[in-house]
Structure formats: C-alpha cells, structure tokens
C-alpha cells in the first residue's frame, strides 16, 4: 500500500515537471526565432541603406560628369585655350594662363580666356545638375620654386586675388560683358585661394599659372539656401587693392 502511494506520488511529480521543461524549450526556441528575425531585419535595413548610398553616389557622379562634359564642349567651341579637365574637375588655360616671373597679372590672351570662361561656368552652375551639386570655384594661383616659401605664398595669393579682381573690379576690361546679376553670382560662387609652389609643373614657366578648381557638394552635404551668405547688391563700384593694369 505504501509502495503504491509512493509510486503514485513519484509519477505525479514527474508529470508536473514535464510541462515546465517543454515550456522552457519553447521559450528558448521563440527567443532564437525572434533574434533571427531581428538580425535579418537589421541586415536588410543596412543593405538597403548601402544600396541607396551607392545609387545616390552613382547618380551624383553621372550628374557631375554630364555637367563637366557639357562645360568642356562649350569651352572648346568658344576658346581653344580653355582646358576643362573632368577627371580632376579643373579648368586651366595653357600658355594663356601663365604669369611672367614675379608678376601677378595675366596678359591680354589670359584675360580674354577668363572673359570667355566665366559665363560658361555660371551657366553650368545654373543648370539642373549645377543647382544640385555645384558648390564653388576655387581660384588657385601657382608659382615656381624661385624664392622662399612665404614669398611664393604671398605671390600665389596675389595671383588668385588678381583673377578675382579682374572679375569684379570696375576698372577691369572684363566688366564690359559681366552684368550686375552675374557679379553677384561670382561673389557667391568664386573663392580666391593661394597655393604657393605646390603641384609644380615640368618647367618654371608652366608652374607660374592660374587654375580654377570646381568643387561639388557630397551626398551628405545639404545645399540650404538659408545658410548661403546674402551679399548686398553692388551699390558702389568695386575697386581692387592690387594694381590693375589697364
């Protein structure tokens, strides 16, 4: 009798334990499934973000290439001395864009090249692609290796400043074909920067040059008009502090 009683109690204890272990196994399985679902969803989200970024970068590259190639074609038709490099996004002027030794202004041919290229750059900036990606034009003046670093730095700054002055100074011959609206756009788009003798060419003559470097917005950059500098309209005639050869 006692043996049967103990046997019943033992079976009841076993029967009470079985559902507990089954529920624990089910819980672990459910947690594993949940973990896999979360992991798959996370990987899918990351993959989609990468694909969107790659597609955005591809679209950006295509837009910039289309803009630059169109600018290159127009420049070639207007003035053969204007060289548009769509690989480095640079505009140079060959021998017309070279400075004499220790001088910071271009000759008549170089001024003519500037006069021809500026409307083309402004047109590119106002294009559909330009409105999305065109950030600014950096005017870079280069020197040869003669003289000290600081001397050449000052000279390169003068050269890039002179190019900017030739676009905005009221005494410059280039002013004849630049409207007040274009002047305002030049002030927003163009930036003068000195480079000294970095990126020297094969000869000293070729090193003494000016180039225009096109910069474009990246995917993460936001072209917010609220952040743009609001330049006042030109009331008085702009006068450069450098000597402007007439």
Curated annotation (Swiss-Prot):
Where does the OmpA-like domain start and stop, copy by copy?
86-218
Q: What happens when the gene is disrupted?
A: When this gene is missing the Zorya system does not confer resistance to SECphi27 in E.coli.
The protein's superkingdom reads Bacteria
Q: Which InterPro entries match?
A: Bact_OuterMem_StrucFunc, MotB-like_N_dom, OmpA-like, OmpA-like_sf, ZorB-like_t1
User: What Gene Ontology terms describe where this protein resides (cellular component)?
Assistant: plasma membrane
List where in the cell it is found.
Cell inner membrane
Q: What does this protein do?
A: Component of antiviral defense system Zorya type I, composed of ZorA, ZorB, ZorC and ZorD. Expression of Zorya type I in E.coli (strain MG1655) confers 10,000-fold resistance to phage SECphi27, 100-fold resistance to lambda, and 10-fold resistance to T7. While most T7 infected Zorya-containing cells undergo abortive infection, a minority produce viable phage progeny. These eventually accumulate to a high multiplicity of infection, leading to culture collapse by 2 hours after initial infection. ZorA and ZorB probably assemble in the cell inner membrane and exert their effect there.
Q: What is the protein's name according to its record?
A: Zorya protein ZorB
